[in-house]
Amino acid sequence: MQKHIIPEEATILDALDKINRLSGGAMTLVVADPEGKITGTLTDGDIRRGLLRGTGLADPVKDLVHRRFMALHVSASADERLQTMRRAREAGIRLLPEIDADGRLAGLVDLSTVRSQLPLTAVLMAGGRGERLRPLTLNTPKPLLEIGGRAIIDYNIENLARNGVKDVYVTVKYLADMMRGYFSRPRHGIMARCIEEESPLGTLGAVSLVNLPPQGHTLVMNSDLLTTIDLEEMYLHHISEGAQATIAAIPYTMSVPYAILTTDGPRVTGIAEKPTATHFANAGIYIFANSLLSRLPHGERTDAPDFLLDAIGRGDKVTYYPINGTWIDIGSPEEFRHASDLMQHHRSLTKLG
């Protein structure tokens, strides 16, 4: 962090030297006054524009400092931080300073690696036997099968890390020791915690084993998905709708190869020639209010559709979020080959857009 800080009395030449020593594309300095308080930021572009206006290399940095700078504040709420990061991305800012209560630098967020900070707990469901993928899953749990040289679940952990989700649980049962071994060290900076099912608990029941806070929201997703879902947009949709649950959905279009009659009793009122209809399929990714998840019976088998239908019947607001982008449910040999072909030349889902 210190390599990005420069005193406002330092010269422009000092600033250029410091910027040249920075690696990667985060060519931004944070300018501090004699008391260590942050007064602004300075980029190589700011310096170039200043030199063109006649600023000299021996002039102080404070002459060119950008004082109306964007920053994260440690006292800000989670949603305020999220909105600041969105505005910074839209403005093309890569490095975002984090300022403490005294106005000093508390940290730096590189938006090229962490695009958001979602206030979510995440639970990845990884206890299934993957029987349709045998013999591949005889000795390897499906989430650890490799696609593009990486475990399937690793792509999902990477997506969580890019969105600043750090509180991550993985439910395990089949070949649980292998899953625990995989998560015995941090993955993408996340130290996930494994929760083992004593008996199969369905597609949602294992979430009842996680000690969730009474307030807040939790992302629940199948661990055998390959998807470029925008988790930030899904979260914002969930919050803006005031939903108790949001289901990620995949558009699924069905074509009928015949002319279809519209009828009223025995009377034909219309004819549609080979119509198509688009439906939305459950993508196996959800955001729940923790208050709703508190209704899960502890340690009992519960499937997500049944739980959601019960919530709808009780009058809870359940919405859907359509996925625009890649989504592959790796549940069959055909889908495994499809995903493998897709990732043959990509090491990261971010390359898919």
How would you name each of these model-derived features?
Residues 219, 226, 232-239, 252-255, ...:
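Catalytic-core segments of class I nucleotidyltransferases/pyrophosphorylases
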Residues 241-251:
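A short, conserved acidic/glycine-rich loop-to-beta-strand motif
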Residues 110-139, 144-145, 152:
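N-terminal nucleotide-binding beta1-loop-alpha1 segment
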Residues 52, 150-223, 228, 233, ...:
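Conserved N-terminal catalytic core of the sugar/cofactor nucleotidyltransferase
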Residues 46-62, 111-123, 280:
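A short, polar/charged loop-to-alpha-helix boundary motif
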Residues 19-23, 27-46, 64, 85-88, ...:
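A glycine-centered beta-loop-beta connector
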Residues 5-26, 32, 51, 72-93, ...:
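The conserved cystathionine-beta-synthase
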Residues 1-4, 10-11, 16, 59-70, ...:
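Bateman (tandem CBS) regulatory domains
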